[in-house]
Amino acid sequence: LSTYYTDEEIQAMDEKAKSEAWYKMWRNFCVSDSYEPGSPQKAFTVAGAIEEGAISGNEVFECGGKLHFGDWDIRCVARAGHGPLTITQGLMKSCNVVMMRIVSLEGKEKFVQYQKIFGFGEKTGIDLPGEASGLIYQASNMDPASLATNAFGQNYNCTMVQMAAGYGSLIN
């Protein structure tokens, strides 16, 4: 700390102030920075839909390369489409269209409920300073295009710690 503060300033700090000063020097982006998770979200989309009975896990969905929501064509990674895919194949091929079809069956209220159950949009409570909460939609202000893109991890954000904690919950 002596690089940035005088001895007098350091001595005047309580432990919390010192922790904050150290944090500023060695900020932990895994805790403090949020990002759009992308494809790692897809497992949570499937898990919530199965848990709610919106899907059984045995469905086959057609991927034509895009789906239309509102004023938007939202594309899959496979621009020409994957063709018919099981849910497992949809996860393996990282198919955005399969996730959009699943979340359309689940609905925005249940999707948002499961984002919260898995810990997105809230601090984890990890014992490190500077934890961010991430940003998720409320069902009341989520339009169809936002629901579709959230299903494959875009248009919302979380921290790496939230994603790791979410996977811990998912695996259990």
Which stretches of residues belong to each language-model region?
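Beta-lactam-recognizing serine transpeptidase/beta-lactamase-like catalytic domain environment
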Residues: 1-39, 44-172
